[in-house]
């Protein structure tokens, strides 16, 4: 029996949709900084065991369609405090990092370094998947059975050989650039030598991608979104770190991670996590990107600390206003 794919998110109410657009514009308005270098090559996947009691497979869980409750809007003072805390965490790690989070319950956003450029590593595979779907539709067809199998291997198991072939299929750099424009990216550039793992992107553009996958915005159809999300929600357990740190019991988590050591940075690690967390009490889009960690483990730890720091502050921050209860 075919696996049931998750349901799609319905349109936001008009007022909330307007608020979300305005909030996203504020998130994307962070002043840019110089982009990082690019990867010489993509590294093979590494495994990290998920602790006992960790994320369970989400294959049969529908995406939450009822609005999540709770959350709070950060006051300017609390926003500044959170920004300073995030900056200290990054500085203490010795790495460089950027994070963007959008709370779909309230429209609240937080970003730090959201316009900074980072090499994607395997996060590029999520963009390649969306672009492949658009490419097939332009040809008047759906993905073939072989393509669906390849995409599954690329997203769930981070297969690099498959990514090489699918990057060729979307048209290498010209095809990628066209797809980036259709998805609304403003700070994403393919590697000049066509190395997909060296694609330069920003946390802000990854939020744009997540909105294209999670909401009815963007060029993807409901069935196309559901297919890609179904793969993101069933990644191999050893790759289910990062964004999932924000999840509670029973929450739906969809993500794609990227990780690789960089010879050009003395073997220090680039570690990225992009995805969403949805449940009765939370509904987040999250993109966190980093480079310069001393090893894989510390890079994952930094990613998860940033995720939990920001989402915890958005849950019910001291001095914040619960959703629907503006300050006086």
List each language-model region with its residue ranges.
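Acidic/histidine-rich, surface-exposed loop or edge segments in extracytoplasmic proteins
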Residues: 57-72, 108-113, 129-132, 156-160
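Penicillin-recognizing serine hydrolase domain
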Residues: 2-19, 25-27, 32-68, 73-97, ...
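Active-site SXXK
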Residues: 107, 117-141, 154, 286
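Glycine/charged-rich beta-loop-alpha catalytic/anionic-binding loops adjacent to active sites
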Residues: 106-115, 187-190
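Conserved catalytic neighborhood of penicillin-recognizing serine enzymes
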Residues: 136-186, 202
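Short alpha-helical patches at coil-to-helix transitions and adjacent helical residues
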Residues: 123-126, 156, 160, 200-207
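Extracytoplasmic/secreted cell-surface and envelope-processing proteins
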Residues: 110, 163, 295-299
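A mature extracytoplasmic/lumenal domain signature
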Residues: 103-105, 114-116, 122-124, 158, ...
């Amino acid at each position: 029996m075919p696996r049931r794919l998750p349901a799609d998110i319905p349109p936001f109410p008009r007022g909330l949709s307007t608020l979300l657009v305005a909030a996203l514009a504020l998130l994307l308005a962070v002043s840019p900084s110089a982009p990082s270098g690019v990867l010489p090559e993509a590294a093979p996947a590494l495994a990290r065991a998920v602790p006992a009691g960790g994320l369970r497979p989400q294959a049969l869980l529908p995406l939450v369609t009822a609005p999540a409750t709770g959350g709070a809007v950060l006051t300017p003072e609390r926003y500044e405090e959170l920004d300073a805390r995030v900056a200290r965490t990054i500085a203490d790690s010795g790495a460089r990092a950027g994070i963007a989070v959008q709370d779909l319950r309230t429209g609240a956003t937080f970003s730090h370094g959201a316009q900074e450029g980072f090499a994607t590593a395997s996060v590029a595979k999520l963009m390649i998947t969306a672009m492949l779907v658009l490419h097939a539709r332009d040809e008047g067809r759906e993905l073939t059975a072989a393509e669906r199998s390849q995409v599954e291997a690329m997203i769930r198991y981070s297969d690099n050989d498959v990514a090489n072939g699918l990057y060729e299929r979307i048209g290498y750099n010209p095809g990628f650039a066209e797809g980036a424009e259709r998805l609304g990216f403003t700070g994403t550039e393919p590697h000049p030598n066509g190395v997909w793992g060296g694609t330069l992107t920003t946390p802000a553009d990854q939020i744009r991608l997540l909105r294209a996958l999670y909401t009815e915005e963007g060029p993807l159809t409901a069935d196309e979104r559901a297919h890609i999300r179904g793969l993101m929600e069933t990644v191999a357990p050893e790759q289910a770190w990062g964004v999932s740190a924000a999840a509670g019991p029973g929450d739906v988590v969809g993500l794609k991670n990227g990780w690789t050591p960089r010879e050009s940075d003395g073997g220090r690690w680039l570690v990225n996590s992009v995805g969403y967390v949805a449940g009765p009490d939370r509904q987040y889009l999250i993109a966190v990107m980093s480079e310069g960690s001393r090893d894989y483990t510390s890079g994952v730890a930094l990613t998860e600390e940033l995720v939990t720091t920001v989402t915890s502050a958005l849950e019910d921050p001291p001095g914040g206003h619960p959703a629907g209860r503006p300050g006086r």
